[in-house]
Amino acid sequence: MNARNLARLFGTLALALFVTVSARAALEPNALFSDGAVLQQKVKVPVWGTTDLGDKVTVTLAGQEVSATPKDGHWRVELAPLAAGGPHVMTISQGSQKTEVKNILVGEVWICGGQSNMQWAVKQSDGGSEAIAGSDNDMIRLITVPRKGSDKPESNFVGKWAAAGPQTVGDFSAVGYFFGRDLQKQLHVPIGLIASNVGGTTAERWMRRSRSTRIPISRT
């Protein structure tokens, strides 16, 4: 094969790879709706994400099928209340694109938000080593929002769900984990814990700028 034909071949392969990657990246659910997720029981469940296309997005889960038309690259659907249990598989499709979110449980979901008292990790706590050693429990799932700021609202974050265990619990919020562990023992349903905490942050840091500026004290 001569150099010209080789260059054409590489060009064709590069274009095919670009088209394939672009198509796969076009439809994306929020990180909260990834493998191993926990959804809140007994209430309507919003599911959202982004897409590069304008075709309707369809979500199926536990016998339900709901659709929505994207607006400005964002889509959102709402599932009817679900009973505790699982595991389930969620299918998200748009045109020829289709993605599956596996091993979903339904139970109680709690946000572990706050400052340093919520950021304090299990491994830093009294009795932390013993708690970590005995933490294996697939009915408790953890996900952490990265500690990074932004001048504007972001539509997604980098993170994934993981079952509680010695490899995942140590760095997680101690208050959040111990609360979730006790709650799971009492309710006997899956527990999802979302860590979103940054030590030393003020209340305004957790609000949209347009809203925080309406509070007189925030302007001083």
Feature map (PLM): residue ranges:
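Bacterial N-terminal signal peptides that target proteins for export
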Residues: 1-11
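Bacterial N-terminal signal peptides
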Residues: 10-20
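N-terminal non-cleavable signal-anchor helices
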Residues: 4, 19-22, 58
